[in-house]
Every structure is written in C-alpha cells, then in structure tokens.
C-alpha cells in the first residue's frame, strides 16, 4: 500500500491501482452507476434517475427552442397571420417555464442523491477503517485519509450531481443537432463532423494529459495535507523548540513543489486545449463554407435553410466547449475513485468465530513480536499468567516494551510467535467486536472528541443516564470540574478536549472507562497526568473500579501499583522478573533501581511558596 504509507512518491501512477490502464469517461460513468447501486437505497436511486430524466427533458426543451427558431426563420416572413409572432413568442415563454421547472427538479433530485451518495461512501469508508487492525491504521497516512474522505468523495458527489447528467445531456444535444444537420444537408453536416473527428483525437490526448496532471496534483495535495496534519499535531513541540521558521520553510517547499508541478503540467496542456477550441470553431466555418460552395448547385439550400443550418452549426459549439471542464471533473473523480478503492482494498482485521468469553483470566505463552520493517524484537519470549480478578502491573525503563506488551494483549498487532489466551481461548479466535466489548482501555494520550462532555462520556456506555454519568465522574474525581464548566455536562469540548487540562482529560477518560464496566481493564500511564492530591483520589476510585476485574496497569509512579497482585518488570523487550512489590524489592536489581528513582523524584517534587521570585 505504497500510496497510503507515510512515504512520499511524486509520481502520477503511484498507489495501489496506479499501474493499471486508466479508464475512459465511459468506464468512470459505469463506476458511478456501480457506486449508486452499492451505496444508495432503491428510493435514492430512483431519485437520482428522476433527476437525470428531468435533465434530459431540459435538453429536449432546448432543442424545441431551436426548432421553433428554425420554424420562425422559415415561416414568419412568409405568413400573413398577425397572431403567428405572438404564438411563437408564447411557445418560447412556455418552453422557458418548462425549462425552469425541469432544471429546478433536476438540481433538487440530483443534489439530494449526490449528497446521499457522499454520506454513504464516507460511512462505508469509516466502517472499513474501523474494521482494520490498529497496526494497519497506524501504517496509513492520516493526511491522505482525510483528503480522501473530504475532497475525493466530494468529486464523487460532483460527478453524480453535475458531470454525468451534463455529459448525457451534451451527448444527446450533439446527436440531435447533427441528425438535424444531416436531414437538411448531409454535405454540410459531414464536412463539419469530419473536422470535428480530428478534434476528438486531440481530445483523447487532452484527456490523457489532464489525467496525468490531476493524478500528480492529487499525490502532491496528499503530501501537503499530510504536512498540515503533522504541523498541527506537533504545534506545541514546534513552538517550544522555537522551530516555527524551519517547519514553515518545509511547508513552503511542499506548496512550492505543488505550484511548480501543476503550472508545468498546465502549460504543457495549453497548446492542445487551444488547438481543440480552434478545431471546434473551424468545424463551424468548414460547414458554412461547404454550404456556400454548393450555393449555385441544383441541390442548394434555400436562404431560410442556410440560416437554419448556420444556427445549428453554431449550436454545436455550446456542448463541445463544455467538454473540457467536464473531462477535468471526470479525471478528478477517477483519481478520487482510485484513492477510495485503495482504502477499500486494505485488509480488515480477521474476526474469529467465538462470542465474548465467560472467563477473564489471561495466559501469555512465549510470545515474540517485532514491528514491521524492523529486525529488533520489541517483545521476546514473554510468558506469564494473570488470574481473573487480579491486578497486573507492567513496569520498566523507557523503551522496555511496556506499551507494546499491552498492545499485544489488546490484539492490536499479530504475534510473530506464541499465543495469548483470554478465558482459555486464543484472543484471535474471538469476534473482534466481542473482544473489544470485553476490554476497556485508558491510554496516556486521551482521545476526546469535539462534542459535549456528556457525549464524550457516553462513548463508554451510549445508554448511560445522567445519574450514571455523574456517579462515574465522581469516582474519577472530575464531577466538580465538569460542573464548573459553563454548561456543565452539556459543555462542548474543543478539538481533542482542548478546553480541559491534561489531568482533566485523563480523569474524563477514566470516568468513561468506569461507565463501560468491562471485565478486563487496561490503564496505560493512567495517573501520569495527575497531581499528588488527585492521584490519591483516583487511586481510591480505581479500588472500586477494579473489583472483580482483570486489570493491567502501566505507570511511571510506582507508588500507584505497590498493591498489585503481580508486577512484570520489562527490560529491552524481555520479562526480567515478576512478583509482588516486596518480592521484587528483595531480589530484582532493576526494580530496586526503578523504585529508588521513583522515591528520589517524589522527594524532589516540591512547591516553594516562600521562595522569592528572581528578578
């Protein structure tokens, strides 16, 4: 999945499907029909086809206007009926009103169906992303996924609401106009059409060039989007490191590369575009000349027929000149379709046949694991047993494999060897949703959404009552903080909970975990963001939360896990030792060192209220 990794490749054909033959507009339109059938309900499909039908009715009305104009050229000057001009004008007004009705209905129905299609494609993609393993998700580019869910799906909406119906109308209009031209004079029609065929060959070259330009644009836009995401996510570090100028320069380079590449591609296509528009005009001129050369022949057209022919020739210019913008959108749609297909092609996490376990002991048998692309094992030959209802703490120096071990226990990654059993069965034999319903996770990096406090809490239990929310919040020592917010539990949080402090976000996540009431609990640095006073209160909440649950805890502050049933001491991906706090203090030198460092950090963590400020 090269195109969805974090690596950059500025090639138009990069990506999962890039090496395949690029489809033409007809395949793209058929692909749209498949999307409509796949994602839209029968009712919305009927809405879309009704919109397309109204669009065709509008085209018929346009042709009727041309027919009335042609009839007026032939008959108005020869008729003595004074009412004929009024009748002609009345018919034109009626056609205008009909066109207004057809256009309004077409736009309404096509827009409803198009936005419905966009919603369903986005929903389908999100469901597919959710069904991927965490390891797979982490290997994808957040910027490119965001671009696909926004811009690429938007082009699908545009294609269904505007481009495909417009192409159908223009093809119909050109067909009817040339049929009329052939009926009046096949020489005029054939001459104009012959010149136009040359333009069609050039149009093929233009389509190929546009496709190349827009694929390159899409690749580089994805890189720019990725840079924006990285810039936003690393803003606090960038400012703290005074690296704003460096990052801005890098971002400017990305934008400049996009500008230069796109401008170069556009400049290369300008000669072909200009030639195509010239040929369109030339086809009209050649048709008129063909009629003029036959002016004195026995088969010459009458003056009124010549005027009608000229009118029809000029009428061909409107749909022909509209082809290039439609090809542009169609090419963008195909790029978007490729990106959507690439996400859909990413394998989802395999789900086993077993429902939720009825026992919650965890057995780890000789597991090893290396991150993709690395040869150094992150976890090597680790074995232990955690009885149901026990508390297991995982400690060790930075980089020792604590979090990786927890991720493996959560089935985020596939093991290289060994097995992990939950309730006597391999964790991979459980249905994915059943497994995640069994466990609750509180990570060091808390995930909060741009929604109300109550809705963020209800991610743990969608059916939780207000009373249950408040009880969980009190256990996590966050209720008073929530009530101090402007709208209490109905207060909207900023992006990633930006209106709360780090400790408050952590406690909100703990309250959410309390609500879920899963039998297996994972706490990754659960109290790392809390001050000493709140840490004691949270510890009391954990005592009630963890009753009769199988609990795994990772913590820097070793004082929070001294009462754990067992402590796993990790070092360089291996299990150095395991036991209770007292047992490890008596025999494990690494744990002794970690404990001494912890005590030293606690001793030096003070406030100095009486210390004078430095001037």
Describe each region flagged by the PLM.
Residues 410:
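Helix-to-loop junction immediately C-terminal to a conserved catalytic motif
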Residues 1-62, 83-88, 106, 110, ...:
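Membrane-integrated ABC transporters
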Residues 123, 421, 429, 454-495, ...:
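ABC ATPase nucleotide-binding domain helical subdomain, centered on the C-loop/LSGGQ "ABC signature"
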Residues 60-71, 98, 164-207, 263-308:
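A hydrophobic transmembrane-helix motif
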Residues 45-65, 71-119, 138, 304, ...:
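Transmembrane-helix motif of ABC transporter permease domains
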Residues 38-46, 134, 151-160, 164, ...:
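An intracellular "coupling" helix at the cytosolic face of ABC transporter transmembrane type-1 domains
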Residues 437-445, 456, 472-476, 490-589:
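ABC-family ATPase nucleotide-binding domain "signature/switch" substructure
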Residues 243, 267, 316-343, 352:
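Cytosolic ends of transmembrane helices, especially the final helix of ABC transmembrane type-1 domains
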